[in-house]
């Protein structure tokens, strides 16, 4: 999962919806791994809630997109998971995901899809806030 290249692709208008969803699915796997590895119960709970809600919101986003544009096809590939090191690394990864969604939102013209992206960004912001609590 390479957030920097993903952001570059979004900004250069080369990322399509399928790639956004693939990135989100990869991120979800990484998030679940962080959830299992964190030594903090509060972070464990926050990351579990983030994973579950992100999965639900992504499902709705894909279904809405497919209602407009037809079924998507996500490229196959491998997912490389990174071990949990500290909460700041998790926060940075969430900030990268937020940036990807905000950039993608700017390039689409569907209000309903933009609203669903706003919900995902709101979830990310809430999770970052909770993870920063001591």
Residue ranges of each PLM-predicted region?
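Conserved alpha-helical segments that form or flank metal/cofactor-binding pockets of metalloenzymes
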Residues: 44-73
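Short, Lys/Arg-enriched N-terminal segments with co-localized hydrophobic residues
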Residues: 2-14
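Helix-loop segments that flank and shape redox-cofactor active sites
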Residues: 26-49, 105-109
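Terminal beta-strand-rich extracellular "head" domains
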Residues: 11, 68-83
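Hydrophobic stripe of amphipathic alpha-helices that form coiled-coil interfaces
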Residues: 34, 38-41, 61-64, 68, ...
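Residue-level recognition of alpha-helical structural elements
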Residues: 13, 20, 43, 109-113
